[in-house]
Amino acid sequence: MKNLTIEHGSLNRSSDEEYSGIRTMGEHNQFINLVIHDVYHGLYINSSNHTLVKNVKVTGQGTGKLGSQGNGIQLVRTSNNIIEDSTISKTRDGIYVEYADKNEIRNNYVSETRYGLHYMYSNDNTFYRNRFNKNTGGAAIMHSKNILLKENQFSFNQGSRSFGLIIQTSTSNTVLDNEFYLNQRGIYLEQSTQNKIEGNKFFHNDIGVELWTTSTSQVFTKNHFEQNIANVLTIGAESYNQWNLNGMGNYWGTELSVLDLDQNQIGDSPVEYRSSLYKLVEDNELAYLFLKSPAIKIYEKINEVLSTQKVMVVDEFPLIEKEKKSVPWMLLFIPALAIAGWIFIKKRRSRLS
């Protein structure tokens, strides 16, 4: 199916039928260059495999009606599908994946939804180079394992309890080389174990990483933290996670002083990241809404002076950004000195002659 516009489908929720602009239950179908709007679900792939969805645009009715409409693209009990180069906005969830394994979702743009991408009971999926902007939550991985999230962007996901990525009740997932910026929380982990968080950039978020005590045995390595209000918060009792792998920790920006006398870009001693904001978040969820307040910086500073902050992270092998080699300033004068010397010698010879 190619080059079609589909609109004005039923939005009735009282029927057992989940209405959608397109619903497929066959094998090896292709949906290319489609525009879908004013329907319940945009595209519903149900119990069918090997489907290609490419360059499909789905538009819902807006954030004010998220609860009364369906998802942009929905995959249920299906596998080996590709969703790529598509744009979804103003639906309930952008892409919803349930009991669906071995799918590839790449190069899509999702905005103004509840969750941009929502995995439930889905394993062995690949999630690559997607962009999630201005959603309540960028992506949600729930009750799933062995998912690879690589080179995605999560930005401006703001609101009450918002996040770029949530990993909940999930295990053995890899979050690699993604960017999290200007989110309320970059990554939020709850009741999850043995996930690998590597090479990601967290900058200008309210909270870079939020870890609840029910999340343990995560591995964090080669991540960059820069100018977040709180780089890491651990909520509840102490959780046991690993902040380095094979002698490679994380980059902590300018907040933590790291000494590197041997110039190998690895700190000579462990560093601790401390914060007192966990107290506010534990006591009252409304605290998330005030993290940008100037009073928060004062609160942190007071607790730092009083030594009442709690250790959030101990990084045994903190990393240091490699400085760009610059030309020594003295070298800039060598050409000028050579020219001046040549002029001086020439004038001296002319006088002698």
Give the label of every model feature segment.
Residues K2-H8, H28-D38, N49-G62, S79-R92, ...:
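Right-handed parallel beta-helix
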Residues D16-E18, M25, S47, Q69, ...:
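Exposed loop/turn and edge beta-strand positions of beta-sandwich/beta-sheet ligand-binding modules
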